[in-house]
């Protein structure tokens, strides 16, 4: 068990359970993005940078799209043509989401330390991107049947995008921001279970 899982356990213990920890984490996020002096979660208009986690409102305005998440929490991968690519963490089961970020944090700990050293330590916008790839993340998620969580986003359709600092991954993983349009998460998982 690495940093992310240990911190989630600690937050749950401090809050008197995981449900209370989730509520505390959601309050932390809302309070932090509203306060411009706090930089661990900050609004940004930049394109995705690999390895960073973004939370934003989304409206793809595509008439033929059967479903979408209005409020994705995305681990950024790379840019594809004019779109941003990333893993919508909302589509993953809680245990897999925690395991993915725990594994990634442990594997990239030296990069994370370097990317967030000095004044960048608590500044999500200033932290350097990480070296993670589409192929690596696709292979990881495919083992569990959740590679469908890799999604593309049109940058101009994102609103109120916030970036989260690496040290706050445990808090953002606790948050439940999913807001699906057209389906439930169970229906999405059923759609992709036959692949």
Over which residues does each language-model region extend?
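Mixed-charge, Lys/Arg-rich low-complexity intrinsically disordered regions
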Residues: 2-53
